[in-house]
Amino acid sequence: MKHRLFTLLFLQLVSLALFAGTVTTYPAPSGAPLNDDFTVRVRATGGLWQTVDTYAWNVDHTNNGRHTIEKSSVAYFDFTDKVEVEVTWNKGDVKTARVRPLSKNIATTLHGNTVCFSLDRPLDLSVEVNGDTYHNLQLYANAATPVYKNAGQVAKALGMKKKDVLFYGPGYYDLGNDSIRVGSNQVLYVAGGAYIKGFASVWQASHAKVIGHGIVNPERQHEGIMVRYSTDVMVDGPITTQIPVGGSERVSVRNAKVISWYGWGDGMNVFASNDVSYNHVFCRTSDDCSTIYCTRKDYHGGCHNISVTDAVYWADVAHPIMIGLHGDIERNEVIEQVVYDDIDILQQREKQIDYQGCIAINNGDNITVRNMTFRNIRIDDIDEGMLFNFRVCYNRKYCHAPGGGIHDITLENISYNGSHANLSLLTGYNEQRTLSGIHFKNLRINGQRIHDKMPGKPGWYKTSDFARIFIGEHAENVTFE
């Protein structure tokens, strides 16, 4: 009997060991800028606690056009299955704490100055104490991926030549005035625990990759990772400042995080590119988080087949989503076949009315914007801005002609919870340059569904009045279902 019980206990322990989760942390290298505002610890369920180093990362705090740099924190780790997290605030008493996006429903408990919670899936989170969003912790809980110790292991795993692997293992690298150029059939591997002070560029390349969970930070006003005039490119895993894609085709960006703090700090631009996809990305930016533009910065042409899935957008300035505006007035360019799905918008803080809009299509330079879907988008209470800014317009500061038109835009399952959003705008330009076919489906404002047959709506009211949306001239076929 004792032998049987021992056997059963042994098998149970083996089973627990086989199916227990794992946690991988990466010590910060000497020379990397750190922040001691928080102490972060993680462990697999029932495992040993591990400390996660926290980096200092600048963010932009605007007030009436003035910009102040604040120092926030960034930490990251990899895991499988489930993980327990402890975040301790070291700078004072914690009265309140929250973990965003709120839609992820992360239940927290507070023990003194320590916020405790559990995760069962990869998430990009903001841990905020006492309502402070400028000295918060950006916490990136990554899905575990293979950890390579040298270029040979990368080459073997990816079926390529060792000479085509640009390997940056754990450590601190100061590129000075130099940069990393990734060419055709090459892979830049930035390991967890690597910190590159500088930037990288995929330039005139095909079949190139930038992978790994490390950091690429110019520590100045500059794009961290650029994809330019290239085809068949993948960016997977890094933390950086900006990832613009220009004049390129078939580009995949996934599990990437960007934070900027300087002027023109757009997060993930698309310029004159086709077949570009983003999946599981995080953008906290000092300008637009996500943009789609036509001709701009020596990139020429329209854009089609752009998709964004599972993103967190936090615009300390300008727009979370901005489409249109820039093009070549002689080409009559088109932006089409665009999908944004499963998006959390945590902030917009923009004083200028022209540049407000959590979802903005400001169409200029004879561009036609058409056939777009915005689906499953959740907007937190913003500081200052509007929900929707769809205008065929002539912005003389940036454009050389009005836009050509905005047509066939579907917005499905969009929700906003808050009280600070300004009046939204939907307008055309003239009888030839119209806004048409704008279809809202299950739009919810503070839980109330806004639709044409909503109960209690007086017959002489416009449905848009209940969403605080102004529908102006040359706007046709705007519906609410």
Task: Report the location of each language-model feature.
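Extracellular "leader-to-stem" segments immediately downstream of a signal peptide or signal-anchor
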Residues: 2, 20-184, 195-209, 215-220, ...
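Bacterial N-terminal signal peptides
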Residues: 8-17
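Non-cytosolic beta-sheet module surface loops
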Residues: 89, 119, 281-282, 312, ...
